[in-house]
Amino acid sequence: MTQVTVKELAKVVDTPVERLLQQMREAGLPHTAAEQVVTDNEKQALLTHLKSGHKAKVEEPRKITLQRKTTSTLRVAGSKSISVEVRKKKVFVQRSPEEIEAERKREMDERRAVENAARQKAEEEAKRRAEEDARNQPAAGQPASAPAQPVAAAEPVREAPAAAAPAPASAAPSADARKRDEQRRPDKPRADDRNARGGDGDRKNAPHRASVKEKAPAPRVAPRTTDEESDSFRRGGRGKGKLKKRNAHGFQSPTGPVIRDVAIGETITVGELSAQMSVKAAEVIKFMFKMGTPVTINQVLDQETAQLIAEELGHKVTLVSDNALEDSLAESLKFEGESFSRAPVVTVMGHVDHGKTSLLDYIRRAKVAAGEAGGITQHIGAYHVETERGMVTFLDTPGHAAFTAMRARGAKATDIVILVVAADDGVMPQTIEAVQHAVAAGVPLVVAVNKIDKPGADLDRIRSELSVHGVTSEEWGGDTPFVSVSAKMGTGVDELLEAVLLQAEVLELKATPSAPGRGVVVESRLDKGRGPVATVLVQDGTLRQGDMVLVGSNFGRIRAMLDENGKPVKEAGPSIPVEILGLDGTPDAGDEMSVLSDEKKAREVALFRQGKFREVKLARAHAGKLENIFENMGQAEKKTLNIVLKSDVRGSLEALNGALNGLGNDEVQVRVVGGGVGGITESDANLALASNAVLFGFNVRADAGARKIVEQEGLDMRYYNVIYDIIEDVKKALTGMLGSDVRENILGIAEVRDVFRSPKFGAIAGCMVLEGTVYRNRPIRVLREDIVIFEGELESLRRFKDDAADVRAGMECGIGVKSYNDVKVGDKIEVFEKVQVARSL
């Protein structure tokens, strides 16, 4: 075997020689020099020594000490500061594996001992019961001696308190063992032992129970008989006279899917839907996530989405309406009384500038059109006029395209529509729209052909154009009266009123003046001094000052009523328009008004409508976002013009919102970030500042606080009183945001007839100009067989060895193309220019 010295061994184990000699001395080996030989036995002895030393170190519990120091500064009076240093120290000791193993063994021994004791007690209890059954068996088998058994068994029961007192310790273990034995037998229902006195009493009652079971044997799962229940009363103690109840579990797992009836209202949350289907909300959320709709448990779903989910999960859906409150309100508003004839409500409709308001002016003998900005109507005006033939209520609607919703409301609230058509202008887009609104509302038409005093008036042309849209004059065999009028001269106005009142007689309009007032909102605005003001048209009943009214989602008590001339009135009957003050907000035009006797009822219905409107709006907005998720992916690239819009009345605000949101295209859009009725306030200015928006005031002005913020922050605020102007300005702003298009104009085309070589420019094309003019230093394209093969710049242009700025059609020239020498005979050189063109919507 190879001899190994201390030095070689130190080199093998990668340890200094001095360190190895020291370890060998500690191991009791005689080596003192590096050249001494180490045998295998000595190596083994050294290895054993090193292992034992390492094991001792390992067995020592390892400690980890954590120290933390935090320094803070405490300020005291007099601008002084005190440095506070907090030191914390924690020591963690790791337990050895031997300790952990010993503890585990100890726990197992204790558990095994407990189980053995329990098993031994169970065996003793079973043995004791077997002995009791053996003792009771002869008593049941001998009927002659049976009467003596109850007496013998009853005596210990009466002496139970005295007998149980000396040995309570022996009674408790038997009760515990019996309880464990009952738990091991699941097929026998357990009795309610909460009122039991202990095992001793049960043991004394055992013979009595055995005799009862012998008298009425029954299977364990069968219901208990009357005798069994009567004998199950506890005897003695607190439980005297109480019947023992069986605690058998009645739940059975369903073998198939459970189909439930799910009632879904207009809105429902995910949690409510899952509760009705008896499934976890997480399952519904997971199902909707698979459908591509991420929701939360409190997400409000609209009726259609909830119906789809419930039906997909296999349940029956019943769509219900959450209008119990509305139904009770409708029942309370029913009124029976004597009906009388009422005045007709007539709406004047037609295209803009066709003379609607001027015609009403002549009828009212008042100059209303002069007071409208720009001479066009921008509000719904309501007036009632006393004529020789009776009273007529007129509604004047705007004719501009932006006021479509106003015209639709006017048609719904009216009995007869006067369609004004200019004789010199003919049928226009808003004229056709007015006809459609009247037909949709089922309202009869009377056509007033205005401006017949102008040259070029053609009545037959208007009859022909209107007949295309289903309006046929009486002269042509239809049922629509046509009346020629002149609002300026007053011609034909009496005949027009005659036709209107004739239509009203045919309709037989009735109303009940003694009923509570009911009507519709024509217009609403926010007055700085008087608060919300609503113009309402009373359709039935009588509206009185002091009435509690419910208008849409607003309510209030009428503090004052004004007629169309601004004069206060105490009451208003059917077909009378009035302004009412006292509402808690500005209602939307078209909202229904009802008089209620109870303020509490009005408040309850108003709050219900507000919450319902908010829930439906949120549900629809969320559904819209999910449906258009892919369409909206590119919306972030759109340029947006933010606008804060304030108007004098609610109808104009709605019309402006619709008109402005309709502007824009795929690259630019308008977003009305805020709006309302009333003047521009400080909060509106702050909203415009935060959203980088433009402030627009339509027939309103800004207060001092808003003007101060606008001046300090340099906001853009503009006032308007004509709807044309605001729409035109927004169009110009959007056009500026579009930028410009680059358009190419072809200036000239030259054909290559020959190719020359120049030491300075390379290949020179001898060309004939075919079309237009060829200019130097302009971009060109080289076409070969009408295919673009090069695009560059025209570097050299000569005519008879002289440089030329341009060469016209029909002349020859030499053309040098920059950085291109592959010119061939027959190629065409196209000279063009790029022009920036402003874009428009």
Swiss-Prot record:
Annotated residues for binding of GTP: 350-357, 396-400, 450-453
Origin species: Pseudomonas syringae pv. tomato (strain ATCC BAA-871 / DC3000)
GO cellular component, one term: cytosol
Keyword Ligase listed: no
Primary site of residence: cytoplasm
Keyword Transmembrane tagged: no
Biased composition (Basic residues): 235-248
One example GO MF annotation: GTPase activity
Similarity comment text for this entry: Belongs to the TRAFAC class translation factor GTPase superfamily. Classic translation factor GTPase family. IF-2 subfamily.
SUPFAM superfamilies from the UniProt entry: Initiation factor IF2/eIF5b, domain 3, P-loop containing nucleoside triphosphate hydrolases, Putative DNA-binding domain, Translation proteins
Region listing for G3, in residue ranges: 396-399
Composition-biased stretches (Low complexity): 136-175
Gene label: infB
Region (G2): 375-379
Name of protein: Translation initiation factor IF-2
Positions of the UniProt region annotated as G4: 450-453
InterPro entries: DNA-bd_dom_put_sf, EF-G-like_DII, IF2_assoc_dom_bac, IF2_II, IF2_N, P-loop_NTPase, Small_GTP-bd, T_Tr_GTP-bd_dom
Domain of life: Bacteria
Function summary: One of the essential components for the initiation of protein synthesis. Protects formylmethionyl-tRNA from spontaneous hydrolysis and promotes its binding to the 30S ribosomal subunits. Also involved in the hydrolysis of GTP during the formation of the 70S ribosomal complex.
Ranges of compositional bias, category Basic and acidic residues: 96-135, 176-217, 225-234
